[in-house]
């Protein structure tokens, strides 16, 4: 939305947006300098800095882009088999000789963390009772439809596509699993943040203003129409609308009010503070992708989650005044 609203230009920036296939590709392109900045899962900056699954590359974030936005989707076949919630899923798993397969978008993303939390809360061991596989978000629904997955945890609109097609149904929304969890951040290399500090702060300021725009209910239709365009999410408008207008359709007649399904600005969403960093680290440790918490010191966490950059961007935005 920052590009569509000319917010980058307002802050003197020329920005080119690139769509990428998956989160690992985005991480690698940041590491090797093919991208200057990226919309990325909150755990990615920590993982890149520590060299978890990649070359160690110090990265930072000065902006959390949103909270929540995900759901756990199960296949329609599981519904036909009698699954209605986590408890009945656990019972069915106990009768199967082969483990069920569930998709997550990235090893270091909230989707992996949230699905594991939901499974554990329902007495299902994510490492022994089921099989978790990494699949790019846009390919989740196709794999569910083809029968390769029994379920997945992913962001919208990939859950709503399953509901609309009656190939799947949602059993949980992410805010019910971990209230106010950080979702995506703006990720850059540390050397970019240092060497091009004025540009970086301006970038954060432009995106912060865009986040505020997206959070206003009266702007949601414009956001939906923009996301539906081929160069962006390229998904049906009705699928995008299902989670963006204050309610959420879980499927099979269950429609509930969810005003906080997507939070882009309110509730202190945008500050990359210590609480959000701690949640990500806790989830990384619990999921096993961070083998030893002592690998990362408190000072390193502060170098990654940069409230100083966020504060500078807020000051710049306040000085310029809102334009939308």
Identify the role of each PLM range:
Residues 180-181, 222:
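Short gly/pro-enriched beta-turn/loop segments at secondary-structure junctions
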Residues 1-127, 133, 150-160, 167-180:
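Short, glycine-/small- and polar/acidic-enriched structural segments
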Residues 70-82, 181-198, 213:
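A bilobed periplasmic-binding-protein/Venus flytrap-type ligand-binding module shared by bacterial periplasmic
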Residues 307-324:
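C-terminal non-catalytic accessory extensions
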Residues 197-304:
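Secondary-structure end/capping motifs
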Residues 125-130, 194-199:
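Inter-helical turn/loop segments and adjacent helix faces that build the functional surface
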């Amino acid at each position: 939305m920052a590009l569509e609203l000319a917010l980058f230009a307002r802050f003197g920036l020329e920005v080119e947006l690139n769509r990428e296939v998956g989160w690992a590709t985005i991480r690698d392109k940041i590491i090797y300098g093919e991208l200057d900045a990226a919309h990325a899962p909150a755990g990615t900056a920590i993982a890149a800095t520590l060299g978890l699954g990649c070359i160690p590359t110090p990265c930072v974030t000065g902006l959390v882009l949103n909270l929540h936005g995900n759901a756990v989707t199960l296949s329609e076949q599981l519904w036909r088999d009698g699954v209605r919630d986590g408890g009945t899923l656990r019972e069915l798993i106990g009768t199967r000789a082969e483990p069920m397969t569930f998709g997550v978008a990235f090893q270091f993303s909230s989707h992996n963390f949230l699905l594991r939390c939901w499974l554990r809360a329902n007495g299902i061991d994510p490492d022994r009772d089921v099989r978790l596989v990494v699949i790019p978000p846009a390919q989740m629904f196709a794999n569910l439809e083809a029968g390769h997955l029994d379920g997945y945890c992913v962001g919208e609109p990939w859950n709503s596509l399953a509901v609309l097609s009656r190939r799947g149904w949602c059993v949980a929304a992410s805010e019910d699993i971990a209230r106010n969890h950080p979702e995506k951040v703006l990720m850059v290399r540390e050397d970019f943040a240092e060497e091009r500090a004025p540009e970086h702060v301006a970038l954060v300021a432009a995106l912060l203003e865009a986040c505020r725009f997206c959070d206003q209910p009266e702007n949601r239709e414009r956001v939906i129409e923009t996301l539906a365009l081929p160069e962006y999410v390229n998904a049906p408008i009705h699928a995008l609308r299902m989670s963006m207008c204050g309610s959420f359709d879980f499927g099979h007649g269950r429609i509930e009010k969810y005003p906080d399904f997507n939070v882009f600005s309110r509730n202190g969403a945008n500050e990359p503070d210590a609480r959000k960093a701690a949640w990500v680290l806790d989830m990384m440790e619990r999921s096993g992708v961070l083998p030893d918490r002592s690998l990362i010191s408190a000072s390193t966490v502060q170098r990654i989650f940069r409230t100083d950059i966020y504060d500078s961007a807020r000051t710049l935005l306040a000085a310029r005044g809102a334009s939308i």
